[in-house]
Amino acid sequence: MKPYSILWLFPTLLVFAGCADHSSQSNGTNTSTNSIVLDSTASVPLPTNPNHPSKEETPMSIAPGRLLQAVSAEDLNLVQTLSDQSTAMIDEQNEKGESPLLIAVHHNMIDIAKILVDHGANINLQDHIQDSPYLYAGAQGKTEILAYMLENSEPDQSIVNRFGGNALIPAAEKGHLANVKLLLTDGRVDIDHQNHYGYTALIEAVALRDGSKIYQDIVRELLAHGANKELRDNQGKTAEDYARELGYDQLLSQLT
């Protein structure tokens, strides 16, 4: 046998030799051993690299901000993976107070929003300007996300936006007929809620817009679901008063 062919045995032999010598000393003998027994079942722990821990030693965890980043990058697969792994960061907020779900709603990321809702994301959590995923979806015409929230979560109707409005008022004012229908059919929203200016959804649909067909349709939906035509805003005006002042004859005919 060539001399170098047994060099690889030396570390192992030394380990077991040391173990054997230690064992003999612990038994009160000083007998040295000239033989080495290799135990095929013995194992010597290998050093671990702290920069590359094994999955068994350190389970993967979600670092703060990682889910927010995944949503912002529209990385559907990573959002799914992180949400499946842990919901601890499902409602984390960035420097603007935006949650992962609110970011998804902002950009109408329908599939990502559904994943987050399925994993318990809070649809009522507000950012620093008092937008919540539910309120924003209602106000900005994110109809598919709004529908999913209504089916799979519980909107808190006591939470209002920075103008004091609920989801219905801006939906009506911005001409989002599908959202108006959805919210009215769901039935949980207060159809006669008044914001800081005393505006209802009905008043805003008349007073703040152009009286076009889409607003005629919205007014029709509101009236069909029992909107109170007699309510007055902070200036003491009704929706009918505004329709008359602005010359919106089609709306006026609906309101009188």
Residue ranges and their predicted role:
Residues D21-T31:
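Bacterial Sec signal peptide processing site at the extreme N-terminus
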Residues L78, D111-I112, E144-I145, A178-N179, ...:
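Conserved ankyrin/ankyrin-like repeat signature
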Residues A17-G18:
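C-terminal motif of bacterial Sec signal peptides marking the signal peptidase cleavage site
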Residues Q69-E74, I103-M109, Y136-K142, P170-H176, ...:
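Ankyrin repeat A-helix N-terminal signature
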Residues L223, N228-T256:
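Leucine-rich solenoid repeat scaffolds
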Residues I90-Q93, I123-Q126, Q157-V160, I191-Q194, ...:
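Ankyrin repeat boundary signal
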Residues S83-A88, K114-N122, A147-D156, K181-D190, ...:
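Ankyrin repeat domain, specifically the short helix-to-loop turn at the C-terminus of the second helix
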